[in-house]
UniProtKB/Swiss-Prot annotation:
Induction: By encystation. It holds the Pfam family 14-3-3. The lineage of its organism: Eukaryota, Metamonada, Diplomonadida, Hexamitidae, Giardiinae. It is found in: Cytoplasm; Cytoplasm, Cytoskeleton; Nucleus; Cell projection, Cilium, Flagellum. It comes from Giardia intestinalis (strain ATCC 50803 / WB clone C6) (Giardia lamblia). SUPFAM superfamilies: 14-3-3 protein. This is 14-3-3 protein.
Length: 248
């Protein structure tokens, strides 16, 4: 009989899934780890994030492309009703996949990861992740549904933001939260002033503390700081908001 997998075996398997770029399998592997006792380690948390980010990312990109094609088709002088219906059905198929992925990780976060977390960086990580996946749901929602989902995202981001003040301004998790929270304000709540204020404060605080950066987090922190600055430049020059902001 085959020997049962240990936690270390599943971590190795998740890394193998990642190297092979088989992210659907990586999600399944991480779900097995999530069913085990105890908190996730920093390494396991990052693997969880990578797994879900890489199954949701291509579908978010696909939705944007299909939605753009749909808008162009509807904008023609003589729209083709059959083509528009084909596109609509396909877009809804992608939306169903997006919803399934988001609801899956949100359930894990709510029922397992958030309640188990005991330290500040883990709590910020999970609340940020909650905010992110509610934001992804809000991207293709409308009306009252969008308002409700955006409210859930805002609550999660606010919880993360409050706890993040316990972390150094240069901490990659705190910076990553500021980056994605500001994107939420800009793209979902259409609040460019609030987005710029949040991003600028996070960037300025990190600059002031730059000399305290550890070698271990230097690369991650400075990369996110660059993304914050890129977004600020984009948002100041692009009042129309057509371009997609950088996120972590």
């Amino acid at each position: 009989m085959a020997e049962a997998f240990t936690r270390e075996d599943y971590v190795f398997m998740a890394q193998l899934n990642e190297n092979a770029e088989r992210y659907d399998e990586m999600v399944e592997t991480m779900r097995k780890i999530s069913g085990m006792e105890g908190e996730l380690s920093d390494k396991e948390r990052n693997l969880l994030s990578v797994a879900y980010k890489n199954v949701i990312g291509p579908r978010r990109a696909a939705w944007r492309i299909v939605s753009s094609i749909e808008a162009k088709e509807k904008g023609r002088q003589k729209p083709n009703a059959k083509r528009i219906e084909q596109i609509r059905v396909y877009r809804q198929k992608i939306e169903k996949e997006l919803s399934d992925i988001c609801n899956d990780i949100l359930k894990l976060l709510q029922e397992q990861f958030v309640p188990r977390s005991t330290n500040a960086d883990a709590k910020v990580f999970y609340y940020k992740m909650q905010g992110d996946y509610y934001r992804y749901l809000a991207e293709y929602s409308s009306g009252e549904d969008k308002e409700k989902i955006a409210g859930s995202a805002l609550n999660a981001y606010n919880s993360a933001f409050e706890i993040s003040q316990q972390l150094p301004p240069t901490h990659p998790i705190r910076l990553g939260l500021a980056l994605n929270f500001s994107v939420f304000y800009y793209e979902i709540l259409a609040s460019p002033d609030r987005a710029c204020e949040l991003a600028r404060k996070a960037f300025d605080a990190a600059i002031t503390d730059l000399d305290k950066l550890t070698e271990e987090s230097y690369k991650d922190s400075t990369l996110i700081m660059q993304l914050l600055r890129d977004n600020l430049n984009l948002w100041v020059t692009d009042s129309a908001g057509d371009d997609n902001a950088e996120e972590k």
